[in-house]
């Protein structure tokens, strides 16, 4: 999301407003506390989201201790990833660009969330490329090759057979959709070779 302005990031998230699975909601109010817009409303120890106030940022989804809040459907996460690729294309299209990713302190949630946990995997390193799609893919695949750090939230939830750490942490988020869409719109390719410099 680094290529989007603050307003652009809000627009990227705005495709889907969350809903609450009432049977899982315990009425703790964590969602209400984290929402800057007062969208979650607690009535009779159950939450409902006022979609007129909701901007779709997803903070309530991340903080819910019972996973009672979710986007309307899996398609919404895919749309978000498409928008991320489209915003990046709008910024770099027709301009010379070089991209650097520092892959360290890989937290289970977006770093904008104050309730974030310890890193899921060891630090990987720094990656650089003229191709932003290949760079993102190389970074994600490098993260997925790392061992899970004990004591991390991923260690508590990971399936030993699932080596996609990013998917294991957020099953409704299709990070690969951004890569595929980035290729489709001409942002970059999925062709990369890692050259290690020590």
Where in the sequence are the language-model features?
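Extended, low-polarity segments enriched in aliphatic/aromatic residues
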Residues: 1-198
């Amino acid at each position: 999301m680094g290529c989007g302005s603050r307003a652009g990031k809000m627009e990227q998230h705005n495709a889907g407003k969350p809903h609450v699975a009432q049977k899982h909601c315990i009425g703790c109010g964590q969602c209400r506390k984290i929402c800057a817009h007062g969208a979650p409303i607690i009535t009779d120890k159950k939450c409902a989201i006022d979609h007129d106030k909701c901007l779709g940022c997803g903070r309530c989804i991340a903080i819910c201790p019972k996973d009672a809040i979710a986007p309307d459907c899996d398609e919404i996460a895919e749309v978000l990833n498409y928008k991320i690729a489209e915003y990046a294309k709008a910024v770099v299209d027709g301009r010379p660009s070089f991209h650097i990713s520092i892959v360290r302190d890989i937290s289970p949630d977006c770093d904008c969330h104050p309730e974030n946990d310890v890193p899921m995997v060891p630090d990987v390193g720094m990656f650089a490329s003229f191709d932003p799609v290949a760079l993102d893919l190389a970074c994600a695949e490098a993260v997925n090759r790392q061992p899970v750090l004990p004591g991390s939230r991923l260690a508590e939830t990971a399936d030993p057979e699932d080596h996609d750490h990013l998917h294991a942490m957020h099953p409704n988020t299709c990070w690969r959709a951004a890569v595929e869409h980035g290729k489709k719109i001409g942002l970059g390719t999925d062709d990369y070779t890692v050259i290690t410099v020590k």
